[in-house]
Design a protein with these regions (language model features):
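Extracytoplasmic gate region of multi-pass secondary transporters
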Residues: 102-115, 213-261
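Central cavity-lining transmembrane alpha-helices of secondary-active solute carriers
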Residues: 2-20, 261-274
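Intracellular juxtamembrane helix-capping segments at the cytosolic ends
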Residues: 67-81, 321-336
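C-terminal membrane-cytosol helix-exit motif in multi-pass small-molecule transporters
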Residues: 108-116, 131-145, 149-158, 174-201
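C-terminal ends and interior cores of transmembrane alpha-helices
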Residues: 33-48, 292-306
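Juxtamembrane intracellular "pre-TM" segments in multi-pass secondary transporters
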Residues: 193-223
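Glycine-rich segments within core transmembrane alpha-helices of 12-TM secondary carriers
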Residues: 84-115, 149
Length: 338
């Protein structure tokens, strides 16, 4: 998780400077290039079975993702009338969860069911019926210890298991690298609308002036703070769905992933619903209402037990659907090239 989000942390500001100096198209091309390279690095990483190689590949991949997000979101805002910019970004962002859903479906139906380590854990459960009377978190500890003992006592068999699982995991990254490479050439030879007003490379002085204006813009600063809290909450909610299902209810990894897919489907459908509602509500009003709903559901996830708590946790996704693009749109309203 740290390596994944490190790419966003180290690339976001350089990406913004890059597209400010050059163009949105240049940002898209560089982002797709890094995305393809990062995904391709998973091939040698799986061959050499080096953990830090995987972390490096993941960081490069997310640097590409950061460039794509930093480029695409303000580009969408700039492509039309300012009054409908936030609604336009919500519509564009509604297609984002489709990729997440596809990835979750592949992980649940193709990857998890083929992983030998998951088969090992299931065999351990069957061999120890007493686990049925234990807390899921305790069972998970026993299964992790059993896997560690297996690695110690039968290192060759454990290494073969790892190698087989890495081949299974590698496939989707190869597909990502191919798709990103194809898109790179599609955008390379496409003519995109120009929305920036400057027609020359920006100087260091002009960039300093831009940062100065941003720091003095109260709405922008508050938007950055709000977005930081939102993204932190989103990561925690979506990461915790699987852990909650496995540790608090006792679901298998594949079953818990199924509930994660449900959360993403709710998130996806709510994005389209909220895009429609923005035709009748001001962005700030709708954002406030859904924030209140998210608070109520968060309290439910904290204090309710079993499936009621899980359903509350999943329901938060409906409220989160509006937040990222709407906070983004409100914070960047009337910003111009900045």
């Amino acid at each position: 998780q740290f390596a994944f989000y490190l790419g966003y942390g180290i690339m976001a500001i350089p990406a913004a400077i890059f597209i400010r100096i050059y163009s949105y198209k240049a940002g898209i091309l560089l982002g797709l290039g890094l995305y393809a390279v990062g995904a391709s690095l998973f091939i040698p990483a799986s061959i050499y079975q080096e953990f830090y190689f995987f972390l490096g590949a993941l960081c490069v991949l997310t640097c590409g993702l950061a460039l794509l997000e930093v480029t695409a979101n303000p580009y969408v805002l700039s492509m039309g009338h300012p009054d409908t910019a936030t609604r336009r970004l919500n519509l564009a962002q509604a297609f984002n969860p489709m990729g997440s859903l596809t990835g979750m479906f592949i992980a649940s139906s193709v990857i998890l069911n083929k992983l030998q380590v998951e088969a090992f854990r299931n065999e351990e459960r069957l061999a120890h019926p007493e686990y049925n009377d234990m807390l899921p978190s305790v069972v998970d500890g026993h299964l992790t210890q059993a896997l560690s003992d297996f690695a110690t006592n039968e290192p060759i068999a454990h290494q073969a298991m790892q190698a087989a699982d890495l081949v299974t995991v590698r496939g989707p990254y190869v597909a990502i690298a191919i798709i990103a490479s194809v898109l790179f050439f599609v955008y390379l030879f496409s003519k995109l609308p120009k929305t920036m007003s400057h027609d020359h490379p920006l100087t260091i002085g002009e960039l300093k002036d831009t940062f100065g204006r941003l720091i003095r813009n109260q709405r922008y600063v508050e938007g950055v703070i709000a977005q930081a809290f939102y993204v932190g909450a989103q990561i925690m909610v979506w990461t915790f769905v699987i852990h909650y299902g496995m540790m608090a209810i006792g679901l298998t990894a594949a079953e818990a992933q199924g509930y994660n897919i449900i959360a993403m489907m709710i998130f996806l459908s709510s994005r389209f619903i909220c895009t429609f509602l923005l035709g009748f509500f001001r962005p700030g009003q709708l954002l406030m209402l859904l924030a209140i709903g998210a608070i109520v559901l968060t309290l439910g996830a904290i204090f309710l037990q079993g499936f009621a708590g899980l359903y509350s946790l999943i329901g938060i996704s409906a409220c989160m659907s509006l937040m990222y693009p709407t906070i983004y749109g409100i914070a960047l309203k009337d910003m111009g090239d900045d």
